[in-house]
């Protein structure tokens, strides 16, 4: 079975997650330091890493590794904050 249709779907879902996160923060409907924002970033980047690696787009893999690392770091900090 050819995996490329599933890889393509994963890539488009990753794009959608990142764009939704950016839209929500840009329209002040979500905080940039919030857990949902960081989850959208990490999930979207993970899906784009899968897609980019499959197609051999290593610069895209690199930027998305950095993106997911930043999201994971921010997520860990957000989860350590006391709840008010």
Where are these regions (language model features)?
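Transmembrane alpha-helical core residues of multi-pass small-molecule transporters
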Residues: 40, 44, 66-67
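Structural signature of hydrophobic alpha-helical transmembrane segments
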Residues: 4-16, 60-68
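Short, charged juxtamembrane terminal tails flanking transmembrane helices
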Residues: 80-84
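Alpha-helical transmembrane segments of multipass membrane proteins
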Residues: 19-23, 46-53, 72
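Short, amphipathic, aromatic/basic-enriched membrane-interface segments that mark the entry/exit
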Residues: 26-37
């Amino acid at each position: 079975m050819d995996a490329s249709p599933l890889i393509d779907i994963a890539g488009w879902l990753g794009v959608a997650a990142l764009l939704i996160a950016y839209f929500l923060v840009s329209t002040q409907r979500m905080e940039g330091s919030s857990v949902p924002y960081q989850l959208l970033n990490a999930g979207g980047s993970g899906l784009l890493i899968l897609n980019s690696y499959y197609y051999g787009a290593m610069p895209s893999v690199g930027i998305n590794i950095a993106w997911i690392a930043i999201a994971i770091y921010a997520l860990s900090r957000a989860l350590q904050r006391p709840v008010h």
